[in-house]
Curated annotation (Swiss-Prot):
GO terms for molecular function: DNA binding; DNA-binding transcription factor activity; RNA polymerase II cis-regulatory region sequence-specific DNA binding; zinc ion binding. Residues 33-101 form the BTB domain. This is Transcription factor Ken. Residues 235-247, 259-275, 476-490 have a biased composition (Low complexity). It comes from Drosophila melanogaster (Fruit fly). GO terms for cellular component: nucleoplasm; nucleus. The lineage of its organism: Eukaryota, Metazoa, Ecdysozoa, Arthropoda, Hexapoda.
Length: 601
């Protein structure tokens, strides 16, 4: 019969971690670089083909097209500044980089040059978008100086624009053209109020068009402080009157947060060119797109402010850092630690040995039993006392003596039993003669003093043996002594003394063969051997288990595909239906063949 080799699946659980460590080691210069990049002014940067080819399709195509025998390859980028390429290498090797907001556009252009898709990265700071919208901010300042004056400008009114789903590849001219689409309105706030449902529908269409265009968008908020709240043009005079009530509502809504908004907006406008931007590899989910469309399609943008961004940042930090209250909170007590599911210790089940199907509860622990003479005397008195032997029967007849039951309802047998119990004569005291086997042989050192006590035999012999009878002294004495013997036997079994003690470790055993098997642990004796592979074992059960597992192909007999397997003996021609029957056969008929001393026969 042809045997097919089994296929094994090998899995390396730390594969990803090792790859990241190797990439970090390559970035630190521990591995020799095989790719040289020549940037502007002939500045050379060293990198690795594996990392750049995995990130940039352009580099991968160049390496595939040029089959060079040389180990090192040089790629020229004469129009790329080396500083930005260093930022890109840091970004590709470590997964994130920190740059100023003014360099985002150059880094983005470099990513586009290397054909790295921009939908796999996003920014965590809105300052770079404010720098890209510098033309928009300058235009708003010019419109403020042209159409407003210090007399009609209220200090607590701010204008907030929300640029939703803005593409990073768009330049400042795109924002200027988008702003020029509303030139029919003199003021941006008037445009928001006068647009009505038409502007809302146009904004929704624009957002839908931008979201369907690509997934490369990021949601950013641009705050322009001290912008004109209303216009002075005559073409919009009829609209300003009708929207006066709406303007008051907006003023009331922004009244509580105008100080914080002004401060944050001034800080953003003043430090927009020096704030660092953290670029991290992160895929944008569809839920963020839906949330941005929901926020961008509404006509009232007053509820979107920096507090929302701060709360979201706090929530994100809460996922990774514990609060100070939780850190300083002490443990209540030890019960919480012990009762937690993580502290449960799972012990494996003991494997069943072939032929020995004893349960875990049958194995009593090896604990020494402290014996005392007083307990033995108390036990002997309780087993021979008439009260203990027939206490239950006397309690059963107690309510009859008190007259709880009517005498007419008793049967003749019960009446006879009651009279015999009431008029029972005192049994004569007969001295009990104890044989030498009744006296315990004290083996332990702690009971040596008790075994040396004088008159121990006379004290035990002084106990009286009382014959208990109800009807006939001769007939009931046998049953009483039998019940007393049963009680004594059960109590003796419950408090059995482990008389066999190991001289190496001090463990005590109740059976001699248990001690004999235990001594093999210390002596190293292996009296059982396998005749098929000459393996030796300390216990016969271990040898039988070895035969049924390692040499299973030897003892298994196959008669066909439709019939069940049979188990044949390796020492004779007998076959069995189950492994248990074979184990009993080997342990009984061929017990001598399992011994090490008979291995040469």
């Amino acid at each position: 019969m042809k045997e097919f080799q089994r296929m094994l699946m090998l899995q390396y659980s730390k594969h990803g971690e090792c790859i990241l460590k190797e990439i970090g080691a390559a970035f630190r210069g521990e591995h020799p670089a095989d790719l040289t990049i020549v940037c502007e002014n002939k500045v050379k940067l060293h990198a690795h083909k594996l990392v750049l080819a995995a990130a940039s399709p352009l580099i991968r195509n160049l390496l595939e097209d040029t089959h060079l025998s040389d180990c090192s390859t040089t790629v020229y980028f004469p129009d790329v500044n080396a500083t930005y390429f260093k930022f890109l290498l840091d970004f590709l090797y470590s997964g994130q980089t920190c740059i100023t907001s003014r360099d985002v556009n150059y880094l983005h252009d470099l990513l586009l040059l290397l054909q790295i898709k921009s939908d796999s990265w996003k920014t965590t700071d809105s300052a770079y978008l404010s720098s890209k919208c510098g033309g928009l901010r300058d235009r708003a300042d010019r419109r403020k100086q042209q159409y407003t004056s210090p007399q009609n400008l209220e200090p607590d009114q701010t204008l907030k624009y929300e640029v939703d789903s803005v593409d990073e590849s768009r330049n400042a001219a795109d924002f200027s053209s988008a702003f020029n689409s509303n030139d029919n309105c003199e003021s941006a706030a008037e445009c928001e109020r006068s647009g009505g449902h038409n502007n809302k529908e146009e904004d929704e269409d624009d957002c839908t068009h931008k979201d369907n265009k690509s997934d490369k968008d990021t949601d950013e908020i641009v705050n322009l402080s001290n912008a004109p709240p209303s216009g002075t043009s005559g073409s919009n005079s009829n609209i300003s009157t009708s929207s006066n009530h709406q303007q008051q509502q907006h003023h009331h809504h922004h009244h509580h947060n105008h100080n914080n908004n002004n401060n944050n907006n001034n800080n953003n406008s003043s430090s927009s060119t020096i704030n660092p931007v953290n670029l991290s590899l992160d895929l944008r989910t569809k839920s963020e797109n839906s949330a941005s469309r929901t926020l961008g399609s509404g006509s009232d943008h007053s509820g979107i402010d920096l507090a929302v961004t701060a709360s979201e940042s706090t929530k994100r930090k809460g996922l990774f850092f514990d609060s100070h209250k939780d850190v300083m909170k002490p443990l209540s007590d030890g019960s919480d630690i012990n009762s937690s599911p993580e502290n449960y210790v799972v012990t494996p089940h003991r494997k069943r040995r072939p032929g020995f199907h004893n349960t875990q509860s049958d194995n009593q622990p090896f604990t020494s039993y402290p014996h005392s003479l007083l307990e033995e005397l108390r036990l002997a008195k309780s087993t021979t006392s008439p009260i203990s032997g027939f206490g239950s029967e006397k309690n059963m007849l107690a309510h009859l003596e008190d007259g709880a039951l009517n005498g007419d309802t008793l049967t003749p047998d019960r009446k006879h039993l009651l009279e015999a119990q009431r008029n029972r004569a005192q049994s004569p005291e007969i001295p009990m003669h104890l044989g030498p086997q009744f006296v315990y042989q004290w083996q332990s050192n702690q009971n040596a003093a008790m075994s040396a006590m004088p008159n121990l035999q006379s004290r035990l012999s002084s106990l009286s043996h009382i014959s208990l009878n109800l009807d006939h002294p001769e007939g009931r004495s046998g049953s009483a002594s039998g019940s007393g013997a049963n009680l004594a036997g059960s109590n003796t079994h419950a408090s059995s003394v482990r008389e066999y003690r190991c001289e190496y470790c001090g463990k005590q055993f109740g059976m001699s063969w248990n001690l004999k098997t235990h001594l093999r642990v210390h002596t190293g004796e292996k009296p059982f051997a396998c005749r098929l592979c000459v393996a030796m074992f300390k216990q016969k059960a271990h040898l039988l288990k070895h035969l049924c597992s390692v040499h299973r192909n030897v003892i298994t007999t196959t008669n066909g595909a439709d019939t069940e397997n049979r188990y044949s003996c390796c020492f004779c021609s007998m076959c069995f239906e189950s492994v248990q029957e074979l184990v009993r056969h080997l342990s009984g008929h061929h017990n001598n063949l399992l011994l090490t001393k008979n291995l040469r026969e």
